[in-house]
Amino acid sequence: MRAWEEFLLLQEKEIGTNTVDKWLRSLKVLCFDACNLYLEAQDSFQITWFEEHIRHKVKSGLVNNNNKPIRVHVTSVDKAAPFYKEKQMQQEKTAYFTMHYGSVNPEMTFSNFLVTPENDLPFRVLQEFTKSPDENGGVTFNPIYLFGPEGSGKTHLMQSAISVLRESGGKILYVSSDLFTEHLVSAIRSGEMQKFRSFYRNIDALFIEDIEVFSGKSATQEEFFHTFNSLHSEGKLIVVSSSYAPVDLVAVEDRLISRFEWGVAIPIHPLVQEGLRSFLMRQVERLSIRIQETALDFLIYALSSNVKTLLHALNLLAKRVMYKKLSHQLLYEDDVKTLLKDVLEAAGSVRLTPLKIIRNVAQYYGVSQESILGRSQSREYVLPRQVAMYFCRQKLSLSYVRIGDVFSRDHSTVISSIRLIEQKIEENSHDIHMAIQDISKNLNSLHKSLEFFPSEEMII
């Protein structure tokens, strides 16, 4: 069929020959009439990939001789597996969909949350959210959409609310958007969609983080749309978090965005310097550490005001103080430097940073750092840029938003770039495999990430 073949040739230019051969040319053409094309996929996973990556292109790019759109229908006939393998898969499915409801940090409570002018509103709204209709006067915003940069306290507030709701016996589901997508793909592949829907819809409240990850995932958005509608129509509570306001979400359907705005969308801002110091002083008191304020200021500066990093460092400090029997001693800056020497070294000049990753990738490909960070779409620069983004995600565990800030790109571009590299790795692309291996070896030998703190077992 000529229209389909022309469409495939166009896709080869956009996403590469290997990808087209693996995912599209392997689709079997079953039947074609003037306005309908029927394809057979090798399995359900191939259908999911088609829906996520190609469906939107087909709608605008596949037309017949009369320039009318061709509707594409994709079905699959999965091959039967041997009995023992089928039984093993059945066990895996059972274990997978007897899913846990998401654990929370017991330290993340409303009482441990530092309320400041920057976060007073979301704090009060989430607290009201956990009360019964009798307690809050029957007024409940649903959904609640929290948005703000990494480290602003979204996770703390969500987990605080979850703990309160679970204490009252509620069935509260807490997932990331990545996990929702993984569950969906697994359900499609294993033919367990009914179990998936039952799990996600028979709950009292849904808390889902990082909704921007749904960007460009049409099949995932479709399923979440119906999940949202089902929960909302039954009066079940929904809390969504993101780094972006609803109107700023990229490649997310308008109907989903409108639903996020049905309740209340609340910005939450990171702590300013004074607020951060106050928050950490409370943690110091909780951990029974006696530390001079200037020593704490030094730690804040040395660890770049990163809240998660600072909390981890304080927990290590408390354990080391206890081990060395220094609980009653006031800690000065020199004491902190001694007790957290390894942590501070990891955060110092030897720690891995996005800039060092970019420098190493640039050296490997023989291009300049400026070209990787620039706007050129030449393949000579695009591939190194994508590889650098991939390493920022893999080595530093940076969020898509943070990587976007580094490379001056929106998060959807970052997500698609990283996925492209992951896909090439899965396809065993020789060039990519060698590049990832060599660059990774170089990064591992030269640096260690700020995230890789000494484990508690190593402190003595």
Swiss-Prot record:
| GO MF annotation list | ATP binding; ATP hydrolysis activity; DNA replication origin binding; lipid binding
> Which GO biological-process labels does this protein carry?
DNA replication initiation; regulation of DNA replication
Top-level division of the source organism's lineage: Bacteria
Chief localization: cytoplasm
- Using the UniProt annotation, give all residue ranges assigned to the region (Domain II): 68-102
Q: Which GO terms describe its cellular component?
A: cytoplasm; plasma membrane
Q: For ATP, which residues are the binding ones?
A: G151, G153, K154, T155
Q: Where is this region: Domain I, interacts with DnaA modulators?
A: 1-68
Tell me which Pfam families the record gives: Bac_DnaA (PF00308), Bac_DnaA_C (PF08299)
Supply the alphabetized keyword list. Answer: ATP-binding, Cytoplasm, DNA replication, DNA-binding, Lipid-binding, Nucleotide-binding
> InterPro entries annotated for this entry?
AAA+_ATPase (IPR003593), Chromosome_initiator_DnaA (IPR001957), Chromosome_initiator_DnaA-like (IPR020591), Chromosome_initiator_DnaA_CS (IPR018312), DnaA_C (IPR013159), DnaA_dom (IPR013317), DnaA_N_sf (IPR038454), P-loop_NTPase (IPR027417)
Location of region: Domain IV, binds dsDNA: 322-460
SUPFAM superfamilies recorded for this chain? P-loop containing nucleoside triphosphate hydrolases, TrpR-like
- Location in or out of the cell: Cytoplasm
Q: Where is this region: Domain III, AAA+ region?
A: 103-321
Q: How does it assemble?
A: Oligomerizes as a right-handed, spiral filament on DNA at oriC.
Task: Describe the function of this protein.
Answer: Plays an essential role in the initiation and regulation of chromosomal replication. ATP-DnaA binds to the origin of replication (oriC) to initiate formation of the DNA replication initiation complex once per cell cycle. Binds the DnaA box (a 9 base pair repeat at the origin) and separates the double-stranded (ds)DNA. Forms a right-handed helical filament on oriC DNA; dsDNA binds to the exterior of the filament while single-stranded (ss)DNA is stabiized in the filament's interior.
Q: What's the record's remark on domains?
A: Domain I is involved in oligomerization and binding regulators, domain II is flexibile and of varying length in different bacteria, domain III forms the AAA+ region, while domain IV binds dsDNA.
Family classification? Belongs to the DnaA family.
Record's protein name? Chromosomal replication initiator protein DnaA 1
Q: What is the lineage of its organism?
A: Bacteria, Pseudomonadati, Chlamydiota, Chlamydiia, Chlamydiales
